[in-house]
């Protein structure tokens, strides 16, 4: 293959596409910035909301306050805002006018004075998202506290040591590190990185193949004394270059947005040093080849730009699969998994996020495995254009 | 010198070209004349080695286009049916790109483009992006791009299609210049006046076959008509076939 001709084709495609502002905007800027910025915004908003709720005065709707005056006094002393509820507790939860409703049973006072368990009913929606849970948990903790303190007093009055009730004491040793807790939060990062490079190469893959076919410039191009596979290899090189550029920009964008992540508030940490970034780049780079080749193959079969966009757009789902899988299923990783494209990248990046030292054989396997599949697909893409059918849109 | 020997092509059940043979010699302009859908573009595509003939062969300066398409293409300059300029590149960038693909040196590309800009009258728009070019400007750029390497054999598919009088005359003048320089020019057309005005040899194609071949005078003599249009209609079997 003549490298000079390959470069000529590659540079022309790059020049042509850089002049197309829309392409540059959508593929590079969207691909690279969308993920990191979205992550920063979502994390900050949810954490601030939860924190606000935790620091705010807790407001509890109560039915039958008079039934448990001692408990009510305790809650007020704990700075709880008690509201008398009109209407049914079920409706109050259903129409979200209250996060939690406390109903005092009618025989509460009798049971209490007899030293039997006195019933209170707590209405809430366990499937409610986010901040409602904070109110429920705070109220439960307060009532549990009240329960314990009254219980201890009763035992002490009878001359029994409350410690007798403590049969087993659990001492927790959480082995999660700041980094591993951060990794949970950042588990979407590999997905955004992979997504970015797929988006970055998408428009070039379409423009240089289906686009060129639609504009009817493929025929004159193939009339030059250059083997078709050389031309296609040049186009693929330009496509992969855009994918790589987007990848590098995504990494840089992520690094630059790192200070805005609410790690401190969560007691989490993530150290993204140059070594971590380089390993990420290394394992993801062959994926750019794979992405460009797959997209070129698919775009080659399309008759028009629009058709190609539809098909290639569907391919964006592929990188989601391993990321989703890993998010919901804790897979015990095996070395061979590293060789599976996309899955290997996900595993390596997740380990990096956890602050673990990743073994070099895993990194090498992720790199080589993906590179082999990528080269194979690139070879198919390049050879496809030897078929006459691929040349004409008519 | 282009020698086409018994080429055929079918698409599914449709026979597009059947047993077409023709010779285009150096220093002459040869026309492939036929109605729309007669098989001109398919024949041309086989001649310039974009698609493979199912039988027969094409020799360009003695090189078999099927066996060595890359070498054969270096001997040809082709203006295909699809002009396909790159709209985001300037006219000059379009031309230079093809020069590089032809393997020319930067200096040779520069010299040759200046010559073509002069000959085709492209100076006023050479540095503009081709998006929004008129039909005539587009054809001129496409011709310059196709002929950047100064090939011995020039093939054009309907070169003056959709052009105004001034552009048409400019193209004709250019082709006559090329003939005078001893080039072999082969073009396809369905326009009688066009063919009549510039061609030395005419091959008439109808329904995928060559039905007549010769100079205009010979074709008129053969049919007993006094103009090419009548002769053409007579040769393709009358107007009921149209």
Spans of model-derived segments:
Chain B
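Conserved ABC ATPase "signature" region
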Residues: 96, 100, 107-125
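Conserved ABC ATPase signature
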Residues: 88, 129-133
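Conserved ABC transporter NBD signature motif
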Residues: 24, 56-67, 71-72
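ABC ATPase "signature
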Residues: 213-214
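Conserved catalytic motifs of ABC-family nucleotide-binding domains
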Residues: 150
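Catalytic Walker B motif of ABC-type/P-loop ATPase nucleotide-binding domains
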Residues: 154-158
């Amino acid at each position: 293959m003549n490298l000079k001709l390959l470069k000529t084709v590659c540079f022309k495609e790059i020049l042509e596409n850089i002049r197309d502002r829309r392409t540059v905007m959508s593929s590079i800027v969207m691909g690279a910035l969308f993920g990191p910025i979205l992550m920063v915004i979502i994390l900050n908003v949810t954490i601030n909301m939860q924190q606000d709720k935790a620091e705010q005065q807790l407001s509890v709707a109560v039915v039958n306050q008079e039934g448990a005056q001692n408990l009510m006094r305790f809650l007020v002393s704990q700075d709880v805002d008690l509201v008398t509820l009109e209407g049914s507790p079920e409706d109050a939860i259903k129409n979200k006018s209250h996060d939690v409703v406390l109903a005092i049973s009618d025989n509460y006072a009798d049971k209490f004075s007899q030293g039997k368990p006195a019933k209170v009913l707590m209405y809430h929606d366990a499937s409610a998202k986010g901040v409602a849970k904070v109110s429920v948990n705070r109220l439960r903790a307060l009532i549990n506290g009240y329960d314990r303190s009254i219980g201890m007093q009763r035992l002490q009055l009878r001359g029994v040591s409350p410690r007798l009730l403590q049969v087993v004491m659990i001492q927790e040793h959480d082995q999660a590190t700041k980094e591993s807790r951060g990794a949970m939060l950042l588990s979407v990062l590999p997905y955004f990185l992979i997504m970015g490079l797929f988006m970055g190469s998408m428009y070039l893959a379409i423009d240089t193949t289906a686009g060129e076919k639609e504009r009817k410039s493929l025929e004159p191009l193939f009339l030059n004394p250059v083997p078709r596979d050389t031309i296609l290899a040049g186009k693929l090189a330009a496509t992969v270059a855009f994918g790589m550029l987007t990848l590098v920009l995504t990494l840089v964008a992520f690094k630059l947005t790192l200070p805005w992540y609410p790690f401190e508030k969560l007691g989490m940490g993530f150290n993204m040093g140059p070594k971590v970034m380089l390993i990420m780049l290394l394992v993801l780079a062959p994926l750019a080849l794979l992405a460009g080749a797959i997209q070129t193959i698919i775009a080659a079969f399309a008759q028009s730009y629009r058709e190609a966009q539809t098909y290639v757009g569907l391919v964006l789902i592929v990188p989601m699969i391993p990321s989703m899988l890993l998010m919901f299923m804790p897979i015990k990783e095996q070395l061979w998994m590293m060789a599976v494209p996309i899955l290997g990248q996900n595993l390596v990046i997740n380990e990096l996020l956890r602050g673990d030292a990743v073994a070099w054989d895993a990194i090498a396997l992720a790199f080589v495995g993906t590179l082999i599949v990528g080269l194979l697909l690139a070879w198919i893409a390049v050879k496809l254009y030897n078929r006459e059918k691929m040349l004409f849109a008519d | 010198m282009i020698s086409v020997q018994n080429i055929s092509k079918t698409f599914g059940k449709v026979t597009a070209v059947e047993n077409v043979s023709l010779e285009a010699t150096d220093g002459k302009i040869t026309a492939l004349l036929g109605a729309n859908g007669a098989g001109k573009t398919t024949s041309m595509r086989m001649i310039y080695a974009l698609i493979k003939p199912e039988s027969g062969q094409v020799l360009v300066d003695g090189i078999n286009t099927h066996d060595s398409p890359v070498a054969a293409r270096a001997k040809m300059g082709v203006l295909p049916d699809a002009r396909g300029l790159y709209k985001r590149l300037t006219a000059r960038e379009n031309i230079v790109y093809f020069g590089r693909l032809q393997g020319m040196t930067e200096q040779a590309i520069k010299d040759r483009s200046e010559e073509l800009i002069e000959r085709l009258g492209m100076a006023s728009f050479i540095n503009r992006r081709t998006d929004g070019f008129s039909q005539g400007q587009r054809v001129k750029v496409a011709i310059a791009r196709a002929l950047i390497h100064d090939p011995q054999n020039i093939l054009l598919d309907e070169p003056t299609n959709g052009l105004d009088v001034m552009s048409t005359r400019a193209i004709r003048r250019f082709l006559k210049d090329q003939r005078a320089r001893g080039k072999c020019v082969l073009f396809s057309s369905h326009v009688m006046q066009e063919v009549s005005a510039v061609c030395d040899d005419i091959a008439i194609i109808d329904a995928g076959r060559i039905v007549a071949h010769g100079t205009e005078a010979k074709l008129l003599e053969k049919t007993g008509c006094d103009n090419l249009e009548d002769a053409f209609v007579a040769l393709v079997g009358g107007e009921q076939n149209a």
